Curated annotation (Swiss-Prot):
This is Tetraacyldisaccharide 4'-kinase. GO terms for molecular function: ATP binding; tetraacyldisaccharide 4'-kinase activity. Its EC number is 2.7.1.130. Keywords: ATP-binding, Kinase, Lipid A biosynthesis, Lipid biosynthesis, Lipid metabolism, Nucleotide-binding, Transferase. It comes from the Bacteria. ATP binds at residues 63-70. It comes from Hahella chejuensis (strain KCTC 2396). CDD domains: SIMIBI. Transfers the gamma-phosphate of ATP to the 4'-position of a tetraacyldisaccharide 1-phosphate intermediate (termed DS-1-P) to form tetraacyldisaccharide 1,4'-bis-phosphate (lipid IVA). It catalyses: a lipid A disaccharide + ATP = a lipid IVA + ADP + H(+).
């Protein structure tokens, strides 16, 4: 099924023409939803008045599937921490299920409750992370519990109830906007013209067909043992054959990274946010098992003997951070004037 969807959205399959009428219906529903929300919002209060709450940056995308939002969120959090600011993060928590919300991500988080991406963000940065299906509720809890200077939403571009002061869209340079159609005929959650109203577009990788303000490169760091504290250099597995496990939006990107590192991979792709059982990553051989950091947060409890994850970091030009900082300074200036 996944392969068929890939062909329709990113290949030349003619199924898109049969699905096109459903895309128009989808667009109609989106338009009605936005109109109704605008009416409701005019008479409702949002989580924290813009004049008193910290600036909110939404990092999202227009397409379904992985584009590189979470690495960019981590990079922004680390940037603000280096500046001495106190950032906080809100997230939907895809892949996690809790009896009650909002959920505060704490020490040794359970990805089955918080979701894999919030757990990863907290484990990498240590900053406050709050999860709720309704991100506005997560925001309110974050503001009630922490004195944050800036809030970042991991995804949420289409979550209309979430206030925002800056929108950053991430696009996978390899996939772009697919066939340019909205769901279900294409991968778009909103038409490409939505980019006209966002602040910044960041391309994850280089591609001539993607027009972006800035380019982000995901740089491999070190291999770290999934169940333990051991580390190895980025080229440690060069020349090896290994099982490659990935439950991310675009597993092909991870597999391509392994090929660049001269690793011959036996590929095992799972749906995004897949909840692993230990048997999923136990193979009848002695080959190492390699995975992404997002997968590793869900596998730490398995006590795997020879499983490793690749830590990656988002590398961006300093001009990107200068643009973000300038926007925050502008917001603070307006707040003082108000």
């Amino acid at each position: 099924m996944i392969a068929w969807v890939e062909r329709v959205w990113y290949g030349g399959s003619r199924w898109k023409f049969l699905l096109w009428p459903l895309s128009w219906l989808y667009l109609l529903v989106v338009a009605i939803r936005k109109t109704l929300f605008a009416v409701i919002k005019s008479s409702a209060s949002e989580a924290g008045s813009a004049s008193i709450r910290p600036p909110i940056i939404v990092v999202g995308n227009l397409t379904v599937g992985g584009a590189g939002k979470t690495p960019l969120v981590v990079a922004l959090v680390e940037h603000f921490q280096r500046r001495g600011l106190r950032p906080g993060v809100v997230s939907r928590g895809y892949g996690g299920v809790s009896e009650s919300y909002p959920v505060l991500v704490e020490r040794n988080p359970d990805p089955g409750v918080t979701g894999d991406e919030p757990a990863l963000i907290y484990m990498r940065t240590g900053c406050p992370v709050v999860v709720a299906p309704k991100r506005a509720q997560a925001l309110q809890t974050l503001l009630d519990m922490y004195d944050c200077d800036v809030v970042i939403s991991d995804d949420g571009l289409q979550h209309l109830a979430l206030p925002r002061d800056m929108e950053v869209v991430v696009v996978d340079a390899q996939r772009g906007w697919g066939n340019g159609l909205c769901l279900p005929a294409g991968p778009l959650r909103e038409p490409v013209r939505r980019l006209q109203s966002v602040d910044l577009v960041v391309s994850n990788g280089l591609h001539a067909q993607v027009n972006a303000d800035y380019t982000m490169q995901l740089r491999p760091g070190r291999w770290k043992k999934v169940s333990g504290d051991e580390e190895r250099g980025v080229n440690y597995f060069a020349g090896y054959t290994a099982h490659a496990v990935a439950a991310i939006g675009n597993p092909g990107r991870f597999f391509a990274t392994l090929a660049d590192l001269d690793v011959a991979s036996i590929q095992h792709a799972f749906p995004d946010h897949y909840s692993y059982a230990q048997k999923d990553i136990e193979f009848n051989d002695d080959l190492p098992v390699l995975m992404t950091e997002k997968d590793a947060v869900k596998c730490k409890s398995f006590n795997l003997e020879n499983a490793w994850y690749l830590e990656v970091g988002a590398e961006l030009n300093s001009a990107f951070y200068e643009r973000v900082d300038a926007r925050l300074n502008e917001l603070r200036s307006h707040k003082k004037d108000g």
